[in-house]
Amino acid sequence: MTKELRSKLFTILKIAFALTLFTIVAITLYKELSHINLKDAIKSFSKINRFWLVALFLSGGASIIVLSIYDVILAKTLKLKIGLAKTIRIGYIVNALNAVVGFGGFIGASVRFLFYKNTTDDKKALFHTISIVLISMLTGLSLLSILVVIHVFDISHIFTPYPWVKWLMYVVALFLPIFVVFTIIKPVQKTHRLLGVYCTIVSGVEWFVAALVLYMSMAIVGVQIPFATFMGIFILAALSGLISFIPGGFGTFDLVVLLGLKALNVNEEAIVLGLSLYRFAYYLFPVLIALILSTFEFRSTAKRYWEDSRILVPVKDMTSLLGSYQKDIIARIPSFAIALLLLFTSLVFFLNNLTIIYDGLYDPNHYIYYIIVSIHTCACLLLLLNVIGVYKLSKRAILFSIISVLFIFIATAYTYASFILLSWLTVIFILLLVFYRRARVIKRPFRYSKLLLSVITGAIILYINHLVIKSTFYSLEIYHIEMLTSILRYYFWITILLVAIIVGVIVWWFEYRYRSSNSRDNIATCESIIDKYNGNYLSHLMYSGDKKFFINDNKDAFVMYRYHNNTYIILGDPIGNSESFYSLLEAFYKEAEYLGYDIIFYQVTDKYMSLYHSFGNQFFKLGEEAVINLTSFTTSGKKKRGLRATLNKLDDLGYSFEVLEPPFSQQMITDLKAISDDWLADKNEMHFSVGSFDEHYISQAPIGVLKDNEQSVIAFCTLMPTYYNGVISVDLIRWKQDIELPLMDSLYLNMLLWSKDNNYEHFNMGMATLSNVGQIPYSFYGERIAGRVFEHFNGLYRFQGLRRYKEKFNPKWEPRFLVYRKHQSLWVSMLKVMRVIRKNN
């Protein structure tokens, strides 16, 4: 059998053993706990002296400091480059988490190695020393087991029915001398032969302190047994929990304590209550303290871990994937810790609804409790729903949490002014204020899927909350009082109303406070960039007056955009120095992420697809744009006789074409406005991706006009310079509707001929929407739907007609795309773009 196979087999057997043991323990515990009277347990808890309860929790929190001695010994032995205070803090965090998710101490050993490997060059010695610390968890119990064997601690009442327990104690007791002798003969470091002895002493003290916390919790609930007997039961229970490999010994430890004390005729309700207090005081409370310490301890650790490490310098040079992920994980520890604290707080205070409602049942003024319990539930729900937002360091989510904690504090102070709960809320409030200043983003981007998930989650939580309250009151036999006083009749609806009001106010305030800047209309800078680096097909639309401009720090590149509904919608590709496009978009995306906005690109070319892809985008083909090569364009030949016929017909009528240069006379503006209004009729102007009839906009470029035989303007088109590779385009094409002549054809033909005569090389006729989109069965689903629209909805919008019309000029078709974030809906993105095109606000 190979070494690898043996390792796999051992792992499988270990997991099978743990699962089997856990199943047996769970079944046995269920049978034992089924006899517990919940009502009696709650009454017993209500009688506990609050001073002693606070003292118990403080003792549990302080007891973990003993475990930090392991880390101090580790640091001194290996001469780690780390201060004493920091060693104690990290030791506290590691040991508190290890107590809950230890798996026999292996998790704690792994975390220790991760934290300390950057402080020493000798990783092998670090690994072996941590192994000594791991094994010493058992040697401490072995030391205490010797005291059981020599009858200092008495568990004879267990030895009698279970004689094998006695032999187990002998075996465990023998482990200590073997371990001590081995570590002295083969030490990790020859200068520290007594390392195993030191760790064993610390382990023994650790287990003894844990026993004192459990003994104190039992004494608080009225369990009075000789300390020597109690210690014997505790040692056996701790040994069972350690061997089980179940995190924290949950279930196994508790079952042995329950059976051991029950054999001494101790009340079951008191045992369960004492064990619960012990679990909260010795396990949960230190974890909460560790999470609080984590929010401060690892704030700058990631940066130092990455930048100051001699070991990681070559890793950085190789851009190590593993190293970068380690950096990210460490940097995320503080936000993850505060998120867990908020999750715990919300769940605990949801249970506090029971206390508030219970008080209200016996209060003559029930209506006050309608409001209090609704506010309390609303705050707990908002706190829970914003856990992920706080983890993402969203300022808005943190503000939601701050307000929620304030509401919970007020409700708790008014109804059940527990010193412990109010102190805890104060700590959470202070932490949230600290994180509010550290917030990385204003808010997260809005998604309808997130909204739906929040609504469903909120509804499920409220329903579970109702079931817990209902089942608890039935168990306490007081539900009939609730039915008579109807304290919960309007509870749900008041909660929903309060959630809606709070969410609405905060969302409105953030939208008002952090609305996109209105000062980005520096056209002069954009003009200078275009003069130096050229523009693109859409750059002339910067004069339309409905766009803002994001210009990079070097002032050599910019994008045109509109803000709409938490989204920056960018028109076309970036403009300017192509070498600056990446840094330009990086800065723009950082701003959008900070403000919680999405980014959509509309009508981009395929030239910069790799650039857009690098920012996590996906693409949808909008259609194709017709570009005519003017060097080969002609109206001669048999195939072009239709074009010649159009020109000849208007020439015979005495019509003429002329290109006018700005500035234009007021009379000309008035005449053009009349034609534009007639052409629009009852339709509205479109915006953003096309120009509109605005005196300032049309005065920025020449205008081609078609005049009748009386020299009156009957049609016009606005030129659209691109400042790009000899390309010109037209924007507005409008004519009098009462003249039944091919005026649009005439305008296009005359513009093509004029452009060719003026040495332009290409003429852009604009986009045929949805043209050549989704025409093969392997296209994306959304594109295939768009293709069907192109084929079958010609009566609704002339998709096919536009392409057929432009085809007669024999253009080259260039694709245009919509670019949007990977997790954003295509249809929502399209609707946002349509909105800014249809509305000028």
From Swiss-Prot:
Enzyme Commission code(s) on record: 2.3.2.3
GO biological process, one term: response to antibiotic
Membrane-spanning parts: 9-29, 53-73, 90-110, 130-150, 165-185, 194-216, 230-250, 271-291, 337-357, 368-388, 393-413, 416-436, 449-469, 490-510
Keyword Metal-binding carried by entry: no
Catalytic reaction list: L-lysyl-tRNA(Lys) + a 1,2-diacyl-sn-glycero-3-phospho-(1'-sn-glycerol) = a 1,2-diacyl-sn-glycero-3-phospho-1'-(3'-O-L-lysyl)-sn-glycerol + tRNA(Lys)
InterPro entries: Acyl_CoA_acyltransferase (IPR016181), L-PG_synthase/AglD (IPR022791), LPG_synthase_C (IPR024320), PG_lysyltransferase (IPR051211)
Topology of this chain in the membrane: Multi-pass membrane protein
Subcellular location: Cell membrane
GO molecular function: phosphatidylglycerol lysyltransferase activity
Keyword annotations: Antibiotic resistance, Cell membrane, Lipid metabolism, Membrane, Transferase, Transmembrane, Transmembrane helix, Virulence
One GO cellular component term noted in the UniProt record for this chain: plasma membrane
Primary subcellular site in the record, as a coarse category: membrane
Cytoplasmic compartment residues: 1-8, 74-89, 151-164, 217-229, 292-336, 389-392, 437-448, 511-841
Extracellular-facing ranges: 30-52, 111-129, 186-193, 251-270, 358-367, 414-415, 470-489
Family: Belongs to the LPG synthase family.
Biological role: Catalyzes the transfer of a lysyl group from L-lysyl-tRNA(Lys) to membrane-bound phosphatidylglycerol (PG), which produces lysylphosphatidylglycerol (LPG), a major component of the bacterial membrane with a positive net charge. LPG synthesis contributes to bacterial virulence as it is involved in the resistance mechanism against cationic antimicrobial peptides (CAMP) produces by the host's immune system (defensins, cathelicidins) and by the competing microorganisms (bacteriocins).
Name of the featured protein: Phosphatidylglycerol lysyltransferase
Organism: Staphylococcus xylosus
Lineage start: Bacteria, Bacillati, Bacillota, Bacilli, Bacillales
Gene transcribed to yield this protein: mprF
